[in-house]
Amino acid sequence: MTISATEALTRCIEHREIFHDEMLHLMRMLMRGEMSPQIASALLMGLRVKKETVGEITAAAQVMREFATPVVTPNPQDLLDMCGTGGDGSHTFNISTTAMFVAAAVGVPIAKHGNRSASSSSGSADVLEALGANLQLSPQAVAECIEATGIGFMFAPAHHGAMKNVAAVRKELGVRTIFNILGPLTNPAGAANQLMGVFHPDLVGIQVRVLERLGSRHVLVVHGKDGMDEASLGAATLVGELKNGVVREYEIHPEDYGLSMMSNRSIKVSNREQSRELVIEALDNVEGAARDIVALNAGLAIYAGNKADSIESALALAFEMIANGAARAKLEEFCAYTRKFAK
């Protein structure tokens, strides 16, 4: 079933949903550059004002996955992605990027999908380069990296070439659109497990249900009640969990796991070098907020990656991997392996 962009815009104005097949058609038009900039921007803003539904986001994510350049691995059902929507305005260091080395040290195979900074002081790609990683890898090289080190990093622009067809519209609009929440839903390696941070509490329930429809295995979607798109030490964290086909929503508190409530002030950064310093500090087991927030998020990743039966036991593993140096060693191993592909 198809629908014209003008008809879709009318639906948005009337606050009516665009159905799945219709959204597939519209999204393919956007990805192929078959929509004028004026209509494309009107449709994106219409969806935003109406508020995108689970069905609309699911269809859009399916199309982005169709158009993506894939990373092919033997067991995508075991892979874990760790990323966030960004846009939380907290300017903290790269917590989930640091936490992936901890989770990988436990044996969770990581296929991280990331980009340069959009709203933060340092995107995942920025800090990984500052740490010495080479990110100019082919899809085959990323797959080899996952096999050899347990970590692969997929630089989003290298895998989503069709996004060039909406880049100018997005830049000119300068506000959030559906594309800001699609990135974490479009892992090129098809990772079936995920720890995703979101910038708004409403997205916790939405994104976990989108991933349910997309066929994910074990997912945690988190939002710190202090506004962070990570599990926070400064407030309770909202969690949407998909496990064994069942969605649950609940809150977790740092004190539940023996962690102290801490302000985010000490983990704010203004550039990638400051972020790099905090990554190293956390992985070197320096006591403080950087280490503890990394351990908390790594614990959630280990649990989502099915290497522990509970968040409590996963958090204990995270602290162990930091204390015994395994997480720092994993960082060095990953960076060294990526440099083998440098031209």
Curated annotation (Swiss-Prot):
Anthranilate 1 binds at G84, N115. Pfam families: Glycos_trans_3N, Glycos_transf_3. InterPro entries: Anthranilate_Pribosyl_Tfrase (IPR005940), Glycosyl_Trfase_fam3 (IPR000312), Glycosyl_Trfase_fam3_N_dom (IPR017459), Glycosyl_Trfase_fam3_N_dom_sf (IPR036320), Nuc_phospho_transferase (IPR035902). The keyword Signal does not apply. The keyword Transferase applies. It catalyses: N-(5-phospho-beta-D-ribosyl)anthranilate + diphosphate = 5-phospho-alpha-D-ribose 1-diphosphate + anthranilate. Its cofactor is Mg(2+). Homodimer. This is Anthranilate phosphoribosyltransferase. The lineage of its organism: Bacteria, Pseudomonadati, Pseudomonadota, Betaproteobacteria, Burkholderiales.
